[in-house]
């Protein structure tokens, strides 16, 4: 067993079963590199694409995109383990290795679930950690589930009086958009898995003849699909951070500018543009008027509270001629070296190690259970 010391022991959990597995690994590598070793004793736990948990060495260099190759957790990455859903075990990570089955490999104080997408960012691991009685960074079960599902995010935002874009939800068994809906949405539309991120499975449709293929592509990742009206406007983002005393703050605003990439002219911020090439320009701070920035920060905090979020979130907006429109809420935003969330906080005067420490401290202060 890894011996205890006076530092807070943090289990950074990454990988997972979703199609965002690789991005989770890259985010974890960045976090492992920036957690303050004087304050935190870090344990790295990878989850394979089929859901097995392994204790890894946590070397950040193994969790990077190298020459276009995406990182992945495998059974060979470390020792198989489990986290018992028993609060009496006090965060024990138990070996599943035949040679040492049941041995306690480590006992952790808090979990940092750097998981993107289903089976991680959607309330599932948060539920496990609640059962296990282990504090964790980020949103609770309800907010994680609501933030992951674009349909229910929009429902909660609308109920709070926040502006959202027009959309149609296609549940399993429905494979088209009616003529009335097409007239209402207009073109282009964006077809997305309802519970996904990193633009995986997302298509831009500029002709209704392209819709069936776009729905099929989205359904490779989620049986529920959302068709969103294209919104003409600037893409802005704002980070939200909760502190241990319950105070909630919003970051400097960032902007994503995408021209035609790889010979395309659609300016679509897709997976490759985000992570594999230089097709996007990220402006932090965004070049917007002070009153616009202030309004977006206020809306970001309102959106954070509308889904009962905790810990942190990144709120994405379109800035249109009629004002800001809330696009999405990410309850566990990316933490790669190019991710907007840490960059926006750095521009706000909060460096990366301080940002991560605030998240861990907030998780410990919050604890588990009803709150």
Swiss-Prot record:
This is D-alanine--D-alanine ligase. One of its GO terms (biological process) is cell wall organization. It comes from Mycobacterium sp. (strain KMS). GO terms for molecular function: ATP binding; D-alanine-D-alanine ligase activity; metal ion binding. The lineage of its organism: Bacteria, Bacillati, Actinomycetota, Actinomycetes, Mycobacteriales. Belongs to the D-alanine--D-alanine ligase family. InterPro entries: ATP-grasp, ATP_grasp_subdomain_1, D-Ala_lig_Van_CS, D_ala_D_ala, Dala_Dala_lig_C, Dala_Dala_lig_N, PreATP-grasp_dom_sf. Its cofactor is Mg(2+); Mn(2+). Mg(2+) 2 binds at residues 328, 330. Keywords: ATP-binding, Cell shape, Cell wall biogenesis/degradation, Cytoplasm, Ligase, Magnesium, Manganese, Metal-binding, Nucleotide-binding, Peptidoglycan synthesis. HAMAP family: Dala_Dala_lig. It catalyses: 2 D-alanine + ATP = D-alanyl-D-alanine + ADP + phosphate + H(+). Cell wall formation. SUPFAM superfamilies: Glutathione synthetase ATP-binding domain-like, PreATP-grasp domain. Pathway: Cell wall biogenesis; peptidoglycan biosynthesis. It is an enzyme of class 6 (ligase). It is found in: Cytoplasm. The keyword ATP-binding applies. Mg(2+) 1 binds at residues 316, 328. Binds 2 magnesium or manganese ions per subunit. Residues 154-361 form the ATP-grasp domain. PROSITE patterns: ATP_GRASP, DALA_DALA_LIGASE_1, DALA_DALA_LIGASE_2. Its EC number is 6.3.2.4.
